[in-house]
């Protein structure tokens, strides 16, 4: 089967949708499907080391949902997309965030075959969907298969575009993230518990809450350290804040390679995801769980879909540094609980392995192809 995966977001900048598309493509190729990835990039001539990647347009930053998305907006998109579709004759085109302007909308308008859309996002509201509904509905109804990565994502998109959505979660490569990865020696110290954060340095990811909680925790005990992985517009401010407050044993690693990241997870004793909202799912939670690391995460809908409090970790109210400090203190003090939660996380992560997830996606592809064929037959008859 010839499949085209369409992403609206710049592949230079790491994010959940881009990672989802990369791993989906890998698993589809492993099953002998022919895969093309269509996405913008701010680097000309860079295939990002991905077979079948086609750069379509240069991205521009657009702010939304407490973050900055980089999407392609160009008058040349129509010509380039039409040429690709005519040349390749895909069996299925799979759009990730299909109603985002740029590459998805353009491709959806032009493709005459089976179209599948995955909706990843959730937020309190989306003014673009609200005011653009009369126009966007025309494109939405061109989709023959509808996927959401979680129940919160389904509830969010259904407010604007009701439909028969299938929930197929994000996946995890459990051969890549696993407890027996070699640790990074520099992140381990005898008698110290390593607390880990992985994410973009932006306000909604909640690192400020974690830094406050960690400062409180250090006043209670000296046997902890904090490791922060990721980059973004607020990194400098966070680093300066730690220096100014004199908070000890905080290490900012910045962006790390995909080869090193699994080893960093395996080096941690506790993983923290303090996001304040705007999360439909927690891919980083799965990465930590598959690595055998107990999770402390915000009690928000997207995260509670992944972690059961008391089983794979603890769920804590967002934006509450005192509650976070208490939760961290509890786990640091209880090595047996950490081990039990880590083992439970490994078991649960197996159900999110890409091999399982892609079975569900291929089922949607088959149904979408049947619907598209029936529509074409009805139109020609």
Residue ranges and their predicted role:
Residues 41, 152, 171:
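Carbohydrate-associated surface elements
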Residues 127, 155, 172-187, 263:
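Acidic anion/phosphate-binding donor-loop and adjacent secondary structure
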Residues 294-297:
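Short hydrophobic beta-strand element within catalytic cores of glycosyltransferases
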Residues 255-256, 263-268, 361:
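Short alpha-helical donor nucleotide-sugar binding micro-motif in glycosyltransferases
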Residues 4, 187-214, 227:
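Conserved donor-binding/catalytic core segment of Leloir-type glycosyltransferases
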Residues 239-256:
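Nucleotide-activated donor-binding/catalytic signature segment of Leloir-type glycosyltransferases, i.e.
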Residues 309-310, 314-321, 330-335:
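Conserved acidic donor-binding segment of nucleotide-sugar-dependent glycosyltransferases
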Residues 7-14, 22, 26-75:
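N-terminal strand-loop element at the rim of the active site
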């Amino acid at each position: 089967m010839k499949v085209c995966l369409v992403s609206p977001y710049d592949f230079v900048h790491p994010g959940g949708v881009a990672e989802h598309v990369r791993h989906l493509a890998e698993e589809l190729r492993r099953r002998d499907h022919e895969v093309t990835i269509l996405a913008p990039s701010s680097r000309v001539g860079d295939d990002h080391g991905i077979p079948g990647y086609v750069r379509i347009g240069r991205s521009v930053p657009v702010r939304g949902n407490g973050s900055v998305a980089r999407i392609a907006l160009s008058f040349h998109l129509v010509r380039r997309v039409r040429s690709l579709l005519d040349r390749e004759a895909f069996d299925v085109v799979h759009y990730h965030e299909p109603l985002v302007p740029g590459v998805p909308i353009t491709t959806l308008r032009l493709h005459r075959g089976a179209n599948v859309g995955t909706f990843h996002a959730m937020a309190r509201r989306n003014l673009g969907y609200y005011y653009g509904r009369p126009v966007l509905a025309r494109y939405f109804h061109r989709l023959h298969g509808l996927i959401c990565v979680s129940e919160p994502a389904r509830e969010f998109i259904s407010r604007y575009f009701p439909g028969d959505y299938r929930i197929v979660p994000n996946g995890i490569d459990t051969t890549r993230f696993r407890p027996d990865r070699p640790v990074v020696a520099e992140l381990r110290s005898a008698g110290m518990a390593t607390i880990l954060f992985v994410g973009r340095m932006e306000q909604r990811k909640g690192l400020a809450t974690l830094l406050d909680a960690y400062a409180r925790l250090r006043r209670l005990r000296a046997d902890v350290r904090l490791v922060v992985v990721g980059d973004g517009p607020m990194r400098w401010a966070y680093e300066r804040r730690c220096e100014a407050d004199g908070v000890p044993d905080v290490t900012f690693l910045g962006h790390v390679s995909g080869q090193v990241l699994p080893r960093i997870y395996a080096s941690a004793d506790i993983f923290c995801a303090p996001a304040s909202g705007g999360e439909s799912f927690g891919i980083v939670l799965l990465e930590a769980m598959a690595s055998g690391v107990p999770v402390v995460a915000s009690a928000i809908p997207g995260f509670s879909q992944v972690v059961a409090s008391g089983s794979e970790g603890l769920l804590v109210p967002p934006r509450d540094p005192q509650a976070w400090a208490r939760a961290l203190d509890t786990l640091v003090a209880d090595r047996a609980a950490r081990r039990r939660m880590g083992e439970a996380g490994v078991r649960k992560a197996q159900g999110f392995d890409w091999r399982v997830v892609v079975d569900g996606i291929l089922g949607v592809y088959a149904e979408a192809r049947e619907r598209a064929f029936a529509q074409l037959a009805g139109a020609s008859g």
